[in-house]
């Protein structure tokens, strides 16, 4: 974290080696230093204060100036680990010092309800996830908070309730009371006073008061989510009930992220980048996929992301052609590449990052050529992004670039427009370009059409235009999966465009996917992912001393 201090510190530590900074006539000013378990370190001094710099072990490569009027030095090795930028890091940490903006989210939800029903009034009602016991066991199952509840509360407590009065704007959170029998096992729970200080709500009561609260007079209508209502909650006091529109309203509101949500996703990316870098450094020195999965999870937990956004995909060799490979238990010997699709979850918000790299530290010519095509697909598609852009058009561009690249390698042959019209490129790029990201890895509001007769768009998880404030993944890929490609080779409509002899050289490549998390802005985008994808940089890290 960043630390502010009025006492100048002229010695910093980078990876256990002391950095000595001698400054002549240093004024009494504030200094900021950054440290983390990833051995990232910034030594920062006012621009006018720099006189001389001596570093033991870590050599500095460049100086950068922040918008705060500070100039800071970046070690060569650090550039591999961390490239968010000082100003974004400071802004992110500052935002996350505040409360999760539950009231802002509630107002967005009401705005959507009133776009459908202009006179919408009444009470929003939501329940947290229940404590569920593992079948035939006395242990509770791992807890995952309901996202609809979290969006309006920021509360990660099980067995809780929430109401929001549309007319008054008053939000009330109900949390479990103290159970003396449980204290000895799990300790004291959060008190209502502590919860009120922690969460962005107006009132905190205990759950034994929920029915009395719902029975208050003059409440015209209740809005709830049908499958998420306890049996003892009847809403008899409400003359009107709507159990469908609230879910839709929350799903649509979640598409446009608040500033706080963006900071959470950026933080999840920062943590996951540490894990991805650790895997890069270790891949040449371990024997099994499971070793790398364990390493990523370890780094995630150590840096603040106890949960994973999804099960990690650690696919070596030809297994990388399986989009959602789950085994993560195969040996690495004799295989070319590793595809790592892994993201930590930070306070209920996901990151979703994919990188592909050579296990032995050097891409083969075939692997490098495919990687370069995929990287071009990603960079050109990302450059299109801004509010209002058609995601269908961006996805279409990815296929056009893939076709041109595969034609240049003679894997495909013929006219590029005819290949696109035939949809032959789907054999090599069978999934959508990306999806919304937020509390869920495949977040809400994308309106996919899995019944689309056009196979090019069938698995595109976002349809239509991208609004400002949305976060989308950009994850093109090219795969050499026999199960998918061989039917195309047997179909004359597609076989005429595929050079089967050339294809034989590429089966071992498996698959290449590169994935970043992108915030859509009014006039462009902000890439929230800083994990390395430059080939030279990746190979340098893999071949570094472990």
UniProtKB/Swiss-Prot annotation:
Gene Ontology BP annotations: proteolysis
Superkingdom of origin: Eukaryota
Residues annotated as binding Mn(2+) 1: 352, 475, 515
Cofactor note: Binds 2 manganese ions per subunit.
Protein name (database record): Probable Xaa-Pro aminopeptidase pepP
Function: Catalyzes the removal of a penultimate prolyl residue from the N-termini of peptides.
EC number: 3.4.11.9
Coiled-coil boundaries: none
Matching Gene3D superfamilies: Creatinase/methionine aminopeptidase superfamily, Creatinase/prolidase N-terminal domain
Lineage: Eukaryota, Fungi, Dikarya, Ascomycota, Pezizomycotina
Gene Ontology molecular function: any one: peptidase activity
């Amino acid at each position: 974290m960043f630390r502010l201090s009025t006492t100048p510190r002229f010695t910093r530590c980078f990876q256990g080696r002391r950095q000595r900074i001698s400054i002549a006539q240093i004024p009494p000013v504030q200094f900021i230093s950054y440290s983390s378990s990833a051995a990232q370190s910034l030594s920062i001094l006012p621009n006018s204060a720099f006189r001389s710099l001596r570093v033991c072990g870590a050599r500095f490569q460049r100086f950068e100036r922040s918008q705060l009027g500070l100039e800071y030095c970046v070690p060569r090795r650090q550039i591999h680990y961390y490239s968010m930028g000082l100003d974004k890091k400071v802004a992110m940490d500052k935002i996350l010092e505040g409360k999760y903006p539950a009231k802002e989210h509630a107002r967005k939800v009401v705005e959507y309800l009133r776009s459908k029903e202009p006179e919408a009034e009444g009470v929003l009602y939501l329940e947290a996830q229940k404590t569920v016991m593992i079948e035939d066991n006395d242990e509770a199952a791992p807890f995952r908070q309901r996202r609809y509840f979290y969006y309006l509360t920021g509360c990660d407590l099980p067995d809780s309730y929430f109401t929001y009065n549309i007319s008054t704007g008053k939000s009330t959170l109900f949390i479990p009371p103290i159970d003396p029998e449980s204290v000895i096992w799990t300790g004291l729970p959060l008190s209502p006073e502590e919860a009120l200080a922690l969460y962005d709500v107006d009132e905190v009561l205990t759950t034994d008061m929920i029915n009395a609260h719902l029975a208050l007079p003059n409440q015209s209508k209740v809005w709830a989510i049908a499958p998420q209502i306890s049996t003892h909650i009847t809403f008899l006091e409400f003359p009107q009930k709507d159990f469908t529109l609230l879910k839709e309203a929350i799903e649509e509101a979640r598409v446009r992220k608040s500033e706080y949500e963006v900071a959470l996703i950026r933080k999840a990316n920062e943590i996951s980048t540490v894990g991805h870098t650790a895997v890069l450094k270790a891949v040449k020195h371990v024997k099994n996929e499971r070793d790398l999965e364990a390493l990523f999870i370890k780094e995630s937990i150590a840096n603040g992301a106890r949960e994973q956004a999804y099960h990690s995909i650690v696919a070596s060799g030809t297994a990388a052609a399986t989009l959602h490979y789950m085994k993560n238990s195969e040996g690495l010997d004799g295989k070319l590449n590793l595809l790592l699709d892994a993201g930590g979850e930070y306070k209920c918000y996901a990151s979703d990052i994919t990188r592909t790299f050579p296990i032995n530290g050097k891409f083969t010519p075939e692997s490098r050529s495919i990687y370069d095509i995929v990287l071009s697909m990603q960079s050109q598609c990302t450059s299109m992004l801004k509010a209002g852009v058609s995601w269908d058009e961006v996805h279409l561009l990815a296929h056009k670039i893939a076709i041109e690249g595969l034609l240049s390698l003679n894997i495909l042959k013929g006219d590029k427009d005819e290949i696109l019209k035939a949809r032959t490129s789907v054999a090599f790029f069978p999934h959508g370009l990306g999806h919304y990201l937020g509390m869920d890895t495949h977040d809400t509001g994308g309106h996919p059409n899995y019944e689309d007769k056009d196979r090019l768009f069938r698995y595109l998880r976002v349809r239509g235009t991208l609004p400002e404030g949305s976060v989308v993944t950009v994850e093109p890929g090219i795969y050499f999966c026999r199960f998918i490609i061989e039917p195309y080779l047997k179909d004359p409509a597609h076989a005429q465009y595929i050079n089967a002899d050339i294809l034989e050289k590429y089966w071992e490549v498996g698959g290449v996917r590169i994935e970043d998390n992108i915030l859509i802005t009014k006039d462009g985008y902000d890439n929230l992912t800083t994990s390395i994808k430059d080939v030279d940089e990746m190979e340098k890290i893999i071949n570094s001393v472990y």
